[in-house]
Amino acid sequence: MLWAHVSLGFQDNNVNLLKSSYTSFTLPNKRNAVLERLIECHGETCVYPARKIFLTPGQTLQGVYYIITGRTRHYMIGTDGTEKILYTLSDGWFYGETPLSLRESTGLFSQAEVETRVRIIPYQDYEILLDTNKVFREAILESYSKKMLIMRHEIESLAFNSCKDRLKRLFCSTADTSYLLENKWYNL
């Protein structure tokens, strides 16, 4: 998942406001043949059918996951049933590094969006590879870092974009500007 910067302009009391927001979309992570050959030697491959929820909050991970092919969605569900997608990952991504490294259970739901093949690298192998293999260590650090940026953008959006501003951006993005009547509202 990467972030694209989107700017939306709108009028508020004759003042032109320019607000920014971040939208997320899924892209494959860069592939690394050396890393993939290394990963083939560790753990087991699992295939999940489309729409299969294979991790739920409270589960203890036995290893770190590497997506060989497919796409996974990682999300939380609030007490009111609201779903918040943290990220959607595709080929070449790791996930589960944080709870595995901290030896804590996951707090997320993980679901295959399409048929997905993953390699699960057991905790012991994960620790050894982090200590002894630079390619593996750098790939894990890059995965952590990209996810940290995603979280930073989420925090930035919540901290600096009030609910009022987010609603204005939503309405502006749905306004039909092809039909304008003087001193009237846009159709949505």
Predicted feature descriptions by range:
Residues N14, P28-N32, Y123, R137, ...:
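A structural signal for well-ordered alpha-helical scaffolds and beta->alpha junctions
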Residues M1-L17, L35-E36, K52-Q62, T88, ...:
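Short N-terminal helix-initiation segments at or just after the protein's N-terminus
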Residues L2-A50, F94-Y95, P99-L100:
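Cyclic nucleotide-binding regulatory module and flanking cytosolic helices
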Residues K52-V114:
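Cyclic nucleotide-binding regulatory domains
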Residues L86-S145, L149:
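Cyclic-nucleotide recognition modules
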Residues D131-L188:
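Polybasic "coupling" helices that flank or enter modular domains
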